[in-house]
Structures are given as C-alpha cells and as structure tokens.
Amino acid sequence: MTIDLLPGHGVRLPAPLPELRFGLTEAAVRGLLAPHGELLPDGVRNTFVCGCRWALAFQLPGVSVTLCSDDRDRFRGVGVGRNPNDDRPACPVGYHGIDLLGWPANELVEALRAEGLPVPDPAHGTLRLGSLYLSRHPAPRRPSAPGRKPRHEGPFTFDVVFLSERADPSDPSERAEPSDPSEATE
C-alpha cells in the first residue's frame, strides 16, 4: 500500500485507488475517487490551499493527502503529510522507488543521490529537488544553556512532501514512468 509520486505525471494512489494525472479537472478527480468511498471512510472533502482554485483532502492510513489545482482549475499538485493522530502504520510515500517519509533526512538524501539525482543537502528542515519539496514539522525546541547557541541541527525526518507539475523538463528527477506503457508516447 504505497503512494507513488510520479514526477511530471501525477500520483499513483494505493490499489485499488486510481492514478491521478496532472491536468485533471476537479470533477474528474472526484469522479475517479467516488467509487472508492469505502477506502476513504472520512470521505473526500474540500480544503483550503493558498493560491489554488480548488483543493481536496482525504485520509489514508497514517497520512493526510491533499490535491490542489492551478489557476486554470487543473490538478497541479499533491501533498502528503504524516498524521500524528492516526495510530495505523503510515502509508509509504514513494519517489523513484524510495520512501520519503519516516527515514532520517541524511539517509534519504544519500539514497536519492545513489539514484543519480542531484539532491542538495537539506537546510533548516527542508529540501527542494525540482518540483519536489520536503519539510518537517517544527521540532520541539530544547532550551540552550544560557549564553550558548546550538552548534548544528540535530538529526530529523521529513513529515510532509509536496509534488507539483513538472518544473524543469530537462531535470532527471522530473522523469517518471507512467503506469500504462501506452502513455509513454504522449
């Protein structure tokens, strides 16, 4: 049961949920999700995302999923965040075959680099790679000793990932294989 982020293409939800391609209308997205109501017990609901004409949200095990549009009313981005209030094991979120959430950030960066992706070092709990953005929820701050500043950022994991439509077609991280080989010629 994996959510696969498909750069330049969209998102493949866990089977039997559908694959959602960037460019779909809100009605098309709702139509694709409607037959799977039993897998989405809290339903698909409207939500607010700044700068989006429409946004939809639903829950999967351990994660919240948000789909949002561009100014042309077309699906343009998917966000997935860990849901700390859900006791179920979280649905993995795959990108180029690598689970993005729940692993130490430095290990995640090494795994992405091993795939040949030009991944920068995470800075201040965030990482941007083309149209992929990862962030963490703010960590509880422990007070520093009086007069001392922390020397470095401690280890952390990412809690939220957002994938938008293709940012740069020449970027190797922006390529994904469609699930239907007939789509490869589009």
What is each model feature region?
Residues 1-171, 180-186:
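Short helix/turn-capping signatures at newly exposed starts of structured segments
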